[in-house]
């Protein structure tokens, strides 16, 4: 395989008036690429609609009827979990907050964690009930806890779907139980699945195959994961299955191997075995096409930053964390590494964040990492001659 070439560009974009540097506010990995996918996967998925993608970049590897609307069944609960995880990570609720179950919670049919009226469970336990057992009662309990009623929660679900660009989705409830107009698409499900993956704590629950909750109960709650791939498919750690007579067998499945993550959404499979087979084969295909590459490692020297024209005064910009990207195997991609230093800093201490390093494939941003200074730079030293700094643009292979 031809060795990948990396182009290092040091960009110091400074207006002569020393106005603030303009940093990008939207990144390519926040949108799913809608380019035609390579559809040669070696088999024909039997589900009505599928999509396979690399979730970090959003690159679609394979799709079939990905924009056709179908009932999503309990895959709906991905949005329920997403809103819960956003509330947790925003600090509005905690995993140990108490949820008191209502009469409506007890009355929910279908998949259940057998919650009783007045029963008190933690947010974490309810999340487990949703992620593992696909509990309709757990989903309603979470909805009522967050918004006061399931109806109000459904409004929030639709608002979030709109924000995410899920243009072919409408939610009527938090559970996915059949309801008129409750529809989504494989592509939209992949969008909310990618968003949920930004809250990796959820994988601590969706990856569990069996769990027992016994505290405060005479009869323990036995949870068994409806997603059998977490037990039988190497690297699978989520996300959510679904089934109703209307929807048939659905899943949003994800797995990691060798630091590469795949996401496959299946809608309308004729059986749970076929659903799992389609998801497994698609992810196998994805893993055969993509690889993970480490660009920089934590605390490594990324770039020497000159402070004068001679270059005898400088500091070293070092990586705050590892920077790994997922790229297609066997391609001729030219990865561009760009180092951006904030020119407005007048004084820095050792360890201060001074900018960031980005990696691109063409115009597509694959990843970024913050950079910090290895030493103190006094105000009198920092960017002493702006014109000299502007002339320091590096372009070479490494």
Residue ranges and their predicted role:
Residues 2-27:
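Sec-dependent N-terminal signal peptides of Gram-positive bacterial secreted proteins and lipoproteins
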Residues 3-4, 72, 123, 379-382, ...:
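Structural motif marking the loop-to-transmembrane transition
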Residues 7, 31-37, 41-43, 73-74, ...:
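Mixed-charge, polar/low-complexity N-terminal
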Residues 24-200:
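Active-site-adjacent loops and short helices of periplasmic peptidoglycan-processing enzymes
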Residues 166-167, 178-183, 187-398:
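Domain-terminus/edge residues, biased toward the C-terminal soluble/receptor-binding domains
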């Amino acid at each position: 395989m031809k060795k990948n070439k990396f182009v290092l560009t040091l960009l110091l974009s400074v207006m002569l008036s020393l106005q603030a540097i303009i940093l990008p506010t939207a990144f390519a990995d926040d949108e799913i690429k809608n380019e035609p996918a390579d559809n040669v996967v070696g088999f024909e998925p039997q589900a009505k609609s599928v999509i396979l993608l690399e979730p970090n970049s959003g690159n679609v590897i394979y799709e079939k009827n990905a924009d056709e609307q179908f009932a999503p069944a309990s895959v709906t609960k991905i949005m329920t979990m997403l809103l819960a995880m956003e509330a947790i990570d925003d600090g509005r609720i905690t995993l140990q907050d108490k949820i008191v179950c209502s009469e409506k919670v007890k009355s929910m049919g279908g998949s259940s964690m057998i919650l009783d009226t007045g029963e008190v469970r933690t947010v974490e336990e309810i999340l487990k009930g949703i992620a593992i057992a696909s509990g309709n009662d757990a989903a309603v309990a979470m909805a009522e806890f967050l918004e006061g009623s399931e109806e109000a929660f459904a409004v929030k679900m639709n608002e979030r779907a709109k924000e995410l660009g899920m243009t072919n989705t409408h939610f009527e409830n938090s559970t996915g139980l059949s309801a008129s107009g409750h529809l989504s698409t494989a592509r939209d499900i992949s969008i909310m699945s990618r968003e949920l993956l930004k809250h990796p704590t959820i994988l601590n629950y969706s990856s569990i195959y069996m769990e027992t909750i016994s505290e405060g109960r005479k009869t323990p709650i036995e949870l068994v994961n409806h997603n059998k791939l977490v037990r039988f498919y190497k690297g699978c750690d989520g996300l959510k299955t679904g089934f109703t007579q209307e929807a048939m067998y659905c899943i949003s499945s994800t797995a990691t191997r060798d630091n590469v993550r795949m996401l496959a959404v299946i809608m309308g499979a004729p059986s749970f075995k076929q659903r799992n087979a389609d998801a497994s084969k698609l992810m196998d295909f994805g893993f055969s096409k993509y690889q993970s590459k480490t660009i920089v490692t934590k605390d490594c020297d990324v770039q020497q930053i000159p402070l004068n024209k001679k270059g005898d005064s400088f500091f070293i910009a070092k990586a705050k964390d590892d920077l790994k990207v997922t790229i297609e195997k066997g391609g001729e991609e030219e990865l561009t590494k760009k180092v951006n230093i904030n020119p407005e800093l007048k004084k820095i201490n050792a360890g201060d964040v001074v900018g960031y390093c980005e990696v691109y494939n063409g115009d597509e941003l694959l990843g970024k990492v913050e950079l910090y200074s290895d030493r103190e730079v006094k105000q009198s030293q920092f960017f002493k001659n702006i014109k000299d700094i502007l002339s320091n643009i590096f372009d070479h292979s490494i």
